[in-house]
Amino acid sequence: MPQEWNISYGNLRFLLKPMGFKHTGLFPEQAVNWDWFSEIIGDAVRSGRSVKVLNLFAYTGGATVAAAAAGASVCHVDAAKGMVAQAKQNAALSGLAGAPIRYIVDDCQKFVEREIRRGNKYDGIIMDPPSYGRGPTGEVWKIEDSVDGLIRLSASLLSDSPLFFLINSYTTGLSPLTMKYILDRYVTDRCGGVSEAAEIALPVKSTHGLLPCGASARWYAK
C-alpha cells in the first residue's frame, strides 16, 4: 500500500493516507451532504448572493473544499494543526489554494463563543463533532452531553437569511431523530424552513447492500 495517494470526486481532489483509528483522511459517505449543500450554495451564488459558511470540527476539509468549490467563503475550524494543514493541501489539489477560506486551529466551542461576542454571522453551518475528546486543558467533550449546547450556541451565529445547518454524528448513542429534535428546537422554531435526519451509508458492491456510516441531521430554508 502506498504511503499516500489522491482520489477525485467530481471536480474535487483529496489526499488520502493511512492514519490512526483506521482513518484515511476522508469520510466518503459525506459526499451525499457535499452534494446537498453545494446545490444550495450554488443556487444562492447564482442569484447574486454572497455565502459565508462555518465548518466546525472540519478535519481535513472535505466539506470545506466542497463548499468553497460551490462558491462560498468558508471558515474552517479544527483543533488539530495537522488536520488543518492537510485541509490546505486538499484545497490546493482541487484548485482552490486562492479561494476565500480561513483556516483556524482552535477549540470549536470556544471559537463559536468568540464569534458570538464579535457579532459574526454565517449563512450555513456544518459540524462533525467527535464522539469523545479532551481539550488542551483537560476538559472532557462527550457528544451526548455537549452537542445540545453547541448547536444552541452555533445557531445564534446564523445570519438573518440562513441557508442551511448540517450536523453529522458517528455515535450510536445520538440518534438521527435526537439530532433533528435539537435542530428543530434551536433552528427550525426560529427560522422556519425544513429539517430532516437519516443514517448515511456506503454502497457495498459485492453484496449490493449498504454499510452504515453514521447519521446526519440537516436543516434548510424553504
Regions found by a protein language model. Give the residues of each.
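Conserved class I S-adenosyl-L-methionine
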Residues: 49-59
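Conserved SAM-binding loop of SAM-dependent methyltransferases across substrates and taxa
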Residues: 60-72
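Short glycine-dipeptide loop
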Residues: 153, 158-165
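C-terminal catalytic and target-recognition region of SAM-dependent MTase-like enzymes
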Residues: 162-222
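Mobile active-site "lid"/loop adjacent to the S-adenosyl-L-methionine
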Residues: 81-83, 105-109, 122-153
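S-adenosyl-L-methionine
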Residues: 80-126
